[in-house]
Each structure stands twice: as C-alpha cells, then as structure tokens.
Amino acid sequence: MAKQKIRIRLKAYDHRVIDQSAEKIVETAKRSGAEVSGPIPLPTEKSVYTIIRAVHMYKDSREQFEQRTHKRLIDIVNPTPKTVDALMGLNLPSGVDIEIKL
C-alpha cells in the first residue's frame, strides 16, 4: 500500500506570521496522530523595485523598495480523516497564502 502524503506550502511577507502558522499546522497534525516533516524553510524570494524620486527631471535621484516573500514547506505523511478535519477547521492569519496538494 502506498503512503499518502499532504504537502502544504506557506507564503507570507512577514516571517513571524508564517512561523506561527507553520507551528499551528504541525501541532494540529501531530495531535491528530499523523507524522509530520517540517516546517522546511525554502529560499526567500526578493523583488527590488527602483523608481525615480522626482516627477520630471533628476534621473540620478532614485529610490529602491524591496519585497521579501518567505516560504515554508510541511509534509504530513499518513494523514487520518481526523487530521484532515482538524486542518480544515484551523484558523490562520490573513497574511499567509496556503497551497495544499494531496
């Protein structure tokens, strides 16, 4: 019999929020009797935007903004129906994007 696996990818701009969410997911899965591997930190994606400060001239005066996207990966091996129900009822912050693959 093949092992079932749930793979959860989390994305957020704030690393504290994503770590709290990952901890909640791991704790919930372990409490329901499933094996958990993770959270595994994935590489942080960094986007840099450069804009000209002035409206009409002064091209040498520029400002840079950056946006960092933190990512985590959690694998839940051999999930029970109780695990799936517990994960569906979990309340996570709005700043976290969740992708679930079965």
From Swiss-Prot:
The keyword Kinase does not apply. GO terms for biological process: translation. Pfam families: Ribosomal_S10. GO terms for cellular component: ribonucleoprotein complex; ribosome. One of its GO terms (molecular function) is tRNA binding. Transmembrane segments: none annotated. Keywords: Ribonucleoprotein, Ribosomal protein. Part of the 30S ribosomal subunit. Belongs to the universal ribosomal protein uS10 family. HAMAP family: Ribosomal_uS10 (MF_00508). Involved in the binding of tRNA to the ribosomes. This is Small ribosomal subunit protein uS10. It comes from Staphylococcus haemolyticus (strain JCSC1435).
